[in-house]
């Protein structure tokens, strides 16, 4: 197996294969890097996922079924501390990734599933939707302020109102585009329909959850909770340090936000979520604690339905 450590940046891929450092442009298609890979026998690529900058490399691994090891970005700084060097450069990071691949990568490497939605990601559409939504909310706040000022002309109010209507149209456009991507695969479309059967979960939350579940298809319940940042953290040391337990918040922030908002409806109409929410409130827990627990419960229910392929029912909730 030919191990290649790749440090990904916005413009370059810095690689190290145990013999030589090479630099390739991080351009659409990764043509130069692809030609280099073609000359390798049984390549294995070790890299850190860096959001949008590593998407092209991930897509290449999918298309060519190249084994890859996606290393948590928190690992490399620790490798640097225990190594000989302390400096951080793209070259040193590529070499650290290579050495990790030689020592442990073969047992951790996997082939990314060929995802028909990878080239035009659902996540990308959701990101565009969030940008438009923030702009729309900002304009609505401005309109509210201007409407209270008698000096504001009706022409300006009409212009801001028209801008809000246009942003709402763009929001719908992004969500419709995401749904069209989902409809490409009948199985994925069916799973989205299953998520929409859950009381409290609307189209945007369902699409957000679907993207998470698709990305981590092999994750179990505890892992998906951690990936959303709902896993608990305890702070305790000896007899003197006893901090309050809290959620880690190390996972997907957008998933947490969507689920937290969904609890407003789920706490009223979803029996299992309502029962948990009311029990915590009756026990004197703060509103934020009760809603966070309800959001975690909603995530677990949604994941159980996604994995089972069965529509929502009270039985699903009992098992979750």
Language-model features: where?
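Short glycine-rich phosphate-binding loop at a beta-alpha junction
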Residues: 42-53
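Nucleic-acid-processing active sites and adjacent nucleic-acid-binding tracks
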Residues: 18-44
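Long, charge-rich intrinsically disordered scaffolds of nucleic-acid metabolism proteins
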Residues: 70-194
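Basic, amphipathic alpha-helical segments enriched in Lys/Arg and hydrophobic/aromatic residues
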Residues: 283-320
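Short, solvent-exposed helix-loop connector elements
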Residues: 37, 110-124, 152, 243-246, ...
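Phosphate-backbone recognition surface of nucleic-acid-processing proteins
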Residues: 203, 209-283, 287, 319-320
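Gly/Thr-rich phosphate-binding beta-strand-loop-beta motif of the actin/hexokinase/Hsp70
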Residues: 1-18, 97, 208
């Amino acid at each position: 197996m030919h191990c290649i450590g790749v440090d990904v940046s916005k413009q370059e891929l810095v690689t190290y294969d145990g013999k030589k450092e090479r630099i390739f442009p991080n351009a659409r298609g990764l043509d130069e890097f692809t030609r280099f890979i073609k000359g390798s026998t049984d390549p294995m690529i070790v890299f850190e996922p860096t959001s949008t900058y590593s998407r092209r490399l991930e897509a290449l691994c999918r298309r060519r079924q190249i084994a890859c090891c996606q290393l948590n970005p928190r690992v490399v700084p620790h490798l640097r501390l225990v190594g000989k060097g302390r400096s951080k450069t793209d070259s040193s990071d590529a070499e650290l990734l290579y050495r990790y691949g030689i020592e442990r990568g073969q047992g951790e490497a996997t082939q990314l599933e060929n995802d028909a939605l990878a080239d035009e990601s659902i996540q990308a559409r959701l990101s565009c939707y969030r940008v438009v939504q923030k702009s729309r909310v900002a304009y609505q706040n401005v309109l509210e302020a201007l409407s209270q000022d008698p000096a504001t002309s009706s022409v300006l109010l009409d212009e801001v109102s028209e801008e809000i209507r246009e942003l709402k149209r763009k929001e719908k456009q992004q969500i419709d585009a995401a749904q069209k991507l989902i409809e490409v695969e009948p199985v994925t479309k069916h799973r989205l329909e299953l998520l929409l059967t859950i009381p409290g979960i609307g189209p945007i939350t369902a699409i957000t959850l679907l993207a998470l579940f698709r990305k981590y298809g092999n994750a179990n319940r505890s892992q998906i909770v951690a990936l959303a940042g709902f896993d608990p953290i305890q702070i305790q040391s000896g007899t003197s340090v006893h901090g309050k337990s809290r959620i880690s918040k190390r996972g997907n922030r957008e998933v947490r936000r969507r689920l937290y908002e969904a609890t407003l409806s789920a706490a009223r109409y979803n029996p299992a979520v309502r029962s948990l929410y009311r029990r915590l409130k009756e026990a004197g827990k703060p509103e934020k604690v009760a809603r966070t627990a309800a959001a975690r419960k909603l995530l677990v229910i949604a994941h159980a339905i996604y994995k089972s392929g069965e529509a929502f029912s009270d039985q699903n909730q009992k098992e979750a």
